[in-house]
Curated annotation (Swiss-Prot):
Role in flagellar biosynthesis. It comes from Aquifex aeolicus (strain VF5). Belongs to the FliR/MopE/SpaR family. The chain crosses the membrane at residues 9-29, 42-62, 65-85, 125-145, 181-201, 210-230. This is Flagellar biosynthetic protein FliR. It comes from the Bacteria.
Amino acid sequence: MDKVTSEEFLITLLLSYFRIVSFLFTFPFYGSFLIPNTIRLYLAFALSFAVLSFINITPVKVNTFVEFLVYALNELLFGFSAGLILRLLFDALIIAGELIALHTGLGFLQMFIPGMTQMSLFSGFFTLYGTLIFLSLGGGEFIILGLAESFKRLPVGSFNIFYLNPEVFLNFFYESFRLGVKIAMPLILTALILNLVLAVVNRFIPQMNVFMVGLPLQVSIGLIILLLSLPLITITMSNHFQDFFKVFEYFIQSFKSP
């Protein structure tokens, strides 16, 4: 391998590294501070080297440093975009947890998960629970394979910001919000019915302190409904994750090799 080929290989390796590392730092699971930065950097380098070893990638020729910076920014943008789609998927679970906490009277309970902002107890529960379901469905392997496929569809140095379709991200945002509301819907309806019943009771028995009776009742019934609806929530998450696999695959395959 001559000097020029070695330089081209090193440049291609660095550009591949930029794409993968920006994806891993955005992806909810790998981007969590539960995984040290050093591990994530080493993992990104290992994946970059594996991609160049097992996928036939044409080395990138760079004439100037400015051209290299443009390529690097494009690769960072692509990795960030792919990771953002996954983050929108898991944000649906946070939305569901916040809605449930709001309608069960437990919104004041907060927890801290490293790598994420402070969130309600239910948001933390659904985030961890959804992550387990995602990994049990082979989501981790699927994402890595999808990222490797992106190097075939869109070789290093060929991405352009104009390839991104804003409508795709808007659809993901809509589906994320819809999934969050769908998961929280049983608890929302239960809280609505309970509040109506308490309003009627307070109308006929004004001497009763509705707040003293309603809050423990709301929490107890909310937890019971959550436990009863957990199998249905699991099925909903699984179906949505499987649909997401197809959509993410379509997102990767929508790019054409130049």
